[in-house]
Regions:
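Sec-dependent N-terminal signal peptides
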Residues: 4-14
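Extracytoplasmic copper-binding redox domains, predominantly the cupredoxin/blue-copper superfamily
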Residues: 18-140
């Protein structure tokens, strides 16, 4: 009986892995991300590609502040697999105050949106965040 359960567990795990997707987001030449609002499922991965120099990814908030991904290096490939549902806010460290922000919505779950809206940002970045939230909600 145990071998059957083990085999079934492997099949279920591999089918979940097989259905996971990877989204690619470029650093653009106009100080933005090529995808500003990414809606993904649990287990999906986002790869940020350094198509233009001087950019990175730094997470400012998410469903569990204590387990946010670390800040990426400038001009470097960066990859994150998302395992918790909720809203994640990230920016480019050098250009965040100018509005280079992105949102990741995992599992179409907005439970922590108020926390994201409460993050201290520059006036320009706050305006961009409001626009990104409108986009995210309109596609939910």
């Amino acid at each position: 009986m145990r071998p059957i359960i083990f085999v079934l567990s492997l099949i279920i795990m591999s089918s979940k892995l097989a259905s996971a997707e990877t989204i690619q987001i470029d650093f653009t030449s106009d100080d933005s991300y090529s995808v500003e609002v990414a809606k993904i499922d649990v287990g999906d991965t986002i790869d940020w590609l350094p198509k233009n120099e001087g950019h990175n990814v730094e997470f400012l908030g998410g469903p569990d502040f204590n387990s946010l991904p670390e800040r990426s290096d400038l001009n470097a490939f960066y990859s994150v697999t998302f395992n918790l549902t909720g809203v994640y806010l990230y920016h480019c460290t050098p250009h965040g105050n100018m509005g280079m922000l992105g949102l990741v919505i995992v599992g179409n779950d907005f439970h922590n949106l108020k926390d994201i809206e409460g993050i201290e940002l520059s006036r320009v970045a706050k305006s961009v965040l409001k626009r990104l939230i409108r986009i995210a909600k309109s596609n939910s």
